[in-house]
Amino acid sequence: MRTVRGPSDRVVVVGAGLAGLSAALHLAGRGRDVTVVERESWPGGRAGRLDVGGYRLDTGPTVLTMPDIIDDTFAAVGETCSGRLDLLTVDPAYRAQFADGSSLDVHSDADQMATAIKEFADAKQAAGYRKLRDWLTRLYQTEFDGFIAKNFDSPLSLVNPQLARLAAIGGFRKWDAMVNRHISDPRLQRVFTFQSLYAGVAPRQALAVYAVIAY
């Protein structure tokens, strides 16, 4: 994102999707006069809903992976997320169904997930899951601090100490290869790699940096 030079007291944000609304709140919190324009008659962008034949259908994102960012957005204008929204944890997050007829409930809690994997496969796979989770945590922390939470005015901005750390922990290796180091059960490997499809990339082709989606 290039830094804007010169006066920026009045800002127009195009689109009232989640990104547009977030940008507007952060700008307003910094004293800017903000106008948001949206082509639809409702805000939310892709995070919408259709009512069809008595059913409610999501039109876009169905998973909230980084609630802390919502907290930061509300805090920018002196509000709190909890004062406006009730975020309820879904447990299990989802159920994975496999071609052999087996199924696995996927939990966000590490202990619950390890127990589920032990019952689904064996203790070795459960231990591998914990090691995988530790690696994903380090990967996320490295990416968030060095890249996700930063603005970049030029490609040279990408060159920083975090880039070397990212390479050292395997961020530029293949996603499926890194997962396979910890887990050998093909079904479990799919559980922790299919998320690359969200980015339109097959797990065998995706770089491990994308694995933060699974985290």
Protein language model annotation of sequence segments:
Residues 5-142:
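N-terminal glycine-rich phosphate/pyrophosphate-binding loop and immediately adjacent elements
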Residues 1-3:
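A short, compositionally biased domain-edge/stem linker segment
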Residues 205-215:
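Residues forming anionic-ligand binding surfaces in small-molecule and nucleic-acid pockets
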Residues 99-207:
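Rossmann-like flavin
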